[in-house]
Amino acid sequence: MDLILLVGIAIALLVILITLYFLQNKNSKTETKAAAQPQRGVPQRAQEGVPRRAQIARNQRNRLRANQNAPAAAAAAAAPAAAAIDTDNDEAAAAGDENGPRVPQGAVLDEKMGAKKRAKMEAKEQKRLQREQELHDREQRKVKEAKEDAERKQQEELEAEVERKRVEAERLAKEEREHKEHEEYLKMKAAFSIEEEGFEEGDADEKESLLADFIQYIKDNKVVLLEDLATAFKLKTQQAIERIQELQANGTITGVIDDRGKFIYVSEAELAAVAKFIKQRGRVSIADLAESSNKLINLTPVATGEGSVQ
């Protein structure tokens, strides 16, 4: 259909040109014939074929009008052809989209386009693609940063929860320890306020004297066999152990009961010396600590007697 339209337009243009050519030839022949036959009463200027001024002006106007109408007619004739060419280009572009790489959007490059304009449009298209890539990269960075922030926040919340549980556990342990020490202190007071086996009834001064003797006996002997301690104060071994634990709970004495049934008394000054040694040395092995403890802690009895350690 497009080919037929183009052929028709070309034939029409050809007919117009041929008609104009014949008309021009006919006018030329008429003027030549008139010049060849001089007429009476006709000025010599007209007989010689020299046109009048009015004729000259009219001819100029006709030529000017023809020159003005020629581009419009050519444009009107070329418009269908251009439309047909554009249609063919669109179909070729569609075929290229299906069978090959897609032409970038905004880069419609006409074959008749100048090299300078083509380069300008290509540069503009390149900038557009670069902006799109930068926007894509920016979005990717935002997504990555948001993910990292979420993971960091989750880790911080987990660490905060662990720390909170640790503090809560320490608080509960401290409260439990204080409660237990208070109960042991109350038991000790009750034990020394009632009559027990091995002690005669007496007034408060005698009880305080007995307690002071009990404590001094431990301090003097340093290492006390629990059975000997119970025998010295006419107590059962379990009662002696409980009283030592009560005295430890209220801070009257410090020491440790080993697995051989002995209580080893350590003074506050000796504990401070051991703590100072550990602080000065930093990390201390068990062997070094044992060796230094033998030097810093004096286990020699102050006085020996009937109830001293064997």
UniProtKB/Swiss-Prot annotation:
One of its GO terms (cellular component) is endoplasmic reticulum membrane. Its main location: endoplasmic reticulum. One of its GO terms (molecular function) is ubiquitin-like protein ligase binding. Coiled coil: none annotated. It comes from the Eukaryota. Residues 1-2 are lumenal. Residues 31-52, 91-157 are annotated as: Disordered. InterPro entries: DDRGK_dom-contain (IPR019153), DDRGK_domain-containing (IPR050899), WH-like_DNA-bd_sf (IPR036388), WH_DNA-bd_sf (IPR036390). Residues 24-310 are cytoplasmic. The keyword Endoplasmic reticulum applies. Keywords: Endoplasmic reticulum, Membrane, Transmembrane, Transmembrane helix, Ubl conjugation pathway. It is a single-pass membrane protein. SUPFAM superfamilies: Winged helix' DNA-binding domain (SSF46785). Residues 109-157 have a biased composition (Basic and acidic residues). The chain crosses the membrane at residues 3-23. It is found in: Endoplasmic reticulum membrane. The keyword Acetylation does not apply. Belongs to the DDRGK1 family. Interacts with Atg9; the interaction is transient. Substrate adapter for ufmylation, the covalent attachment of the ubiquitin-like modifier UFM1 to substrate proteins. Required for ufmylation of Atg9; protects the nervous system during aging, possibly by stabilizing Atg9 and supporting its function. This is DDRGK domain-containing protein 1. The lineage of its organism: Eukaryota, Metazoa, Ecdysozoa, Arthropoda, Hexapoda.
